[in-house]
């Protein structure tokens, strides 16, 4: 049985030891194969601030807040995701006798994404097209390397960076990356560890929290 676990950057910052202990306990039972996919938004911001740089966020016309990942920010994302977070997770798991193997989605071209070279944002209530964007949308996951690692009793730990169609490193949404990994590997269980309360029917209405939902109901909401 295979479990794919997504770890959000906020949990790496706040509940690191508990997350590692839980993963180690599952791994040591030898009943499940595990794959971990992680993000690192807070750590990207932390590194930017250490460099006296401010994270760049914009509102989209649809009302969402989005990170603007320019050439400078993607360099920091590589350090935060592929360096700091990934190796910290691997180190902690190894200390718990978990044979973790860490890498990013661009290694081996495992996670493929379509780069968003420009994004439409609101600046002073005006629609502006921001170019030079180094984020992407996951479109495919190659499984050969992952299956090799799993077959040899390694636990893959994947940072949510991906390879664009032109070979550029792009920052991708960790949740989407993890879901694509789970689908590509035909995972039996997908677990998302996050610091949010759950799914909201209307995000602005805190009383609209959905505590339990089936896959069919979720598809209807996303339709």
Regions found by a protein language model. Name each.
Residues 1-223:
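Nucleotide/pyrophosphate-binding catalytic subdomain
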């Amino acid at each position: 049985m295979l479990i794919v676990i997504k770890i959000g950057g906020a949990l790496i910052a706040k509940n690191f030891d508990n997350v590692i202990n839980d993963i180690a306990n599952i791994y040591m039972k030898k009943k499940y194969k595990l794959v971990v996919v992680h993000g690192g938004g807070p750590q990207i911001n932390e590194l930017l601030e250490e460099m006296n740089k401010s994270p760049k966020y914009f509102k989209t016309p649809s009302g969402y807040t989005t990170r603007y990942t320019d050439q400078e920010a993607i360099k920091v994302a590589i350090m935060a995701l592929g360096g700091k977070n990934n190796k910290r997770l691997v180190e902690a798991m190894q200390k718990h006798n978990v044979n973790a193997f860490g890498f990013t989605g661009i290694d081996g071209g495992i996670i493929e994404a379509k780069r968003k070279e420009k994004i439409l944002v609101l600046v002073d209530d005006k629609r502006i097209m921001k170019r030079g964007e180094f984020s992407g949308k996951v479109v495919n996951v190659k499984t050969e390397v992952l299956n090799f690692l799993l077959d040899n009793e390694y636990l893959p730990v994947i940072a949510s960076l991906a390879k664009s169609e032109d070979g550029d490193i792009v920052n991708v949404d960790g949740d989407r990356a993890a879901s694509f990994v789970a689908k590509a590997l035909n995972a039996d269980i997908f677990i998302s560890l996050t610091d949010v309360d759950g799914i909201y029917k209307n995000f602005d209405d805190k009383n609209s929290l959905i505590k339990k939902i089936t896959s069919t109901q979720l598809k209807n909401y996303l339709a």
